[in-house]
Each structure stands twice: as structure tokens, then as C-alpha cells.
Amino acid sequence: MMTYIVFILSIIFVMGFVGFSSKPSPIYGGLGLIVSGGVGCGIVLNFGGSFLGLMVFLIYLGGMMVVFGYTTAMATEQYPEVWVSNKVVLGTFITGLLMEFLMVYYVLKDKEVEIVFKFNGMGDWVIYDTGDSGFFSEEAMGIAALYSYGTWLVIVTGWSLLIGVVVIMEITRGN
């Protein structure tokens, strides 16, 4: 049952990406990103990553919602274009959905995914093994490694997000 839940969430995830990649108006692009981000957090939660899913949900959908709201407010149109108002955008949206449904058919026909990697077990996803010490939470070890060995990565990521917000505000401010 969990496999089908992840499969359905993955379909919604890709449909959200198709929705914002074929966006005719910034409002719908932000909506597609919000849907995809929320569903992505649900997928991470389904695999047991409660801390990571919560952090992504709070940081991405909390922090970036401010940026989406600000840029959408600055780029509002009186009559926003929707997916069906332009034939090229509608064609792109339908083509993306068709590709997703063909992928779903291919996966359901063979009962596994073997396009680039073969995902038929979770044993390949083990990150850190401590030998005879028993069961450890991968999340706790990952967070400890991120903040101990990856300090510079956290600093560069925070700085990049700050610069990204400043650049977006300067672009949308106008003259």
C-alpha cells in the first residue's frame, strides 16, 4: 500500500513540475512549485525522513512563499493567462502529462523501474553503517554530519539564499 501512496505522490509531484514549467502566468508557476514542494515533503515523510521533511516544508514552503508572494504581487496581471488560453502552453502541458502517463504505464507493466538505476530494494540507500553497534537513525547521523563536517556547505547555502532573495527583489523592483 505504501508503494502505491509513493507512486501517486510521485505522479502529483511530476504533474506539479509540468504545471510550473509550462506556466503562462507567474501566479500559476508559484502554485505549481508550492504543490510540488508539499508533495515532495510528503514523499520524504513516507520514507521515514520526518526531520528532513519537516525542515524542507518549513524552510522551502515557509521562506520561499514570501519570495513567491512578493514576486507574484509585483508581476500581477489584470487578466492572467491560463493553461488553456495559449495553444503552445496547452500543448506543452498535455505533452508533459502524456509523458508522465506513459512512464506510469511502463512502470506498472514491468513492476519495477530499470531506466537508469534498478530500485527494487532499500538496501542500496544505506549511508552509514557502524558495524556491531545496532540500529541507528540515519537522520540523526546525517544532521550531525551536516553540521560538523558540512559547516561551510551550510554557510554557503545560507549566503546563496540571501543573495537570491536580494537579486529577486532588485529584479522585481523595477526602475
Swiss-Prot record:
<keyword id="KW-1133">Transmembrane helix</keyword>
<keyword id="KW-0496">Mitochondrion</keyword>
<dbReference type="GO" id="GO:0032981">
    <property type="term" value="P:mitochondrial respiratory chain complex I assembly"/>
</dbReference>
<keyword id="KW-0679">Respiratory chain</keyword>
<keyword id="KW-0999">Mitochondrion inner membrane</keyword>
<dbReference type="InterPro" id="IPR042106">
    <property type="entry name" value="Nuo/plastoQ_OxRdtase_6_NuoJ"/>
</dbReference>
<dbReference type="InterPro" id="IPR001457">
    <property type="entry name" value="NADH_UbQ/plastoQ_OxRdtase_su6"/>
</dbReference>
<keyword id="KW-0472">Membrane</keyword>
<keyword id="KW-0249">Electron transport</keyword>
<dbReference type="GO" id="GO:0045271">
    <property type="term" value="C:respiratory chain complex I"/>
</dbReference>
<feature type="transmembrane region" description="Helical">
    <location>
        <begin position="25"/>
        <end position="45"/>
    </location>
</feature>
<feature type="transmembrane region" description="Helical">
    <location>
        <begin position="88"/>
        <end position="108"/>
    </location>
</feature>
<feature type="transmembrane region" description="Helical">
    <location>
        <begin position="149"/>
        <end position="169"/>
    </location>
</feature>
<keyword id="KW-0830">Ubiquinone</keyword>
<dbReference type="GO" id="GO:0005743">
    <property type="term" value="C:mitochondrial inner membrane"/>
</dbReference>
<comment type="function">
    <text>Core subunit of the mitochondrial membrane respiratory chain NADH dehydrogenase (Complex I) which catalyzes electron transfer from NADH through the respiratory chain, using ubiquinone as an electron acceptor. Essential for the catalytic activity and assembly of complex I.</text>
</comment>
<keyword id="KW-1278">Translocase</keyword>
<keyword id="KW-0520">NAD</keyword>
<dbReference type="InterPro" id="IPR050269">
    <property type="entry name" value="ComplexI_Subunit6"/>
</dbReference>
<comment type="subunit">
    <text>Core subunit of respiratory chain NADH dehydrogenase (Complex I) which is composed of 45 different subunits.</text>
</comment>
<keyword id="KW-0812">Transmembrane</keyword>
<protein>
    <recommendedName>
        <fullName>NADH-ubiquinone oxidoreductase chain 6</fullName>
        <ecNumber>7.1.1.2</ecNumber>
    </recommendedName>
</protein>
<feature type="transmembrane region" description="Helical">
    <location>
        <begin position="1"/>
        <end position="21"/>
    </location>
</feature>
<dbReference type="Pfam" id="PF00499">
    <property type="entry name" value="Oxidored_q3"/>
</dbReference>
<comment type="similarity">
    <text>Belongs to the complex I subunit 6 family.</text>
</comment>
<keyword id="KW-0813">Transport</keyword>
<feature type="transmembrane region" description="Helical">
    <location>
        <begin position="47"/>
        <end position="67"/>
    </location>
</feature>
<dbReference type="GO" id="GO:0008137">
    <property type="term" value="F:NADH dehydrogenase (ubiquinone) activity"/>
</dbReference>
<dbReference type="GO" id="GO:0006120">
    <property type="term" value="P:mitochondrial electron transport, NADH to ubiquinone"/>
</dbReference>
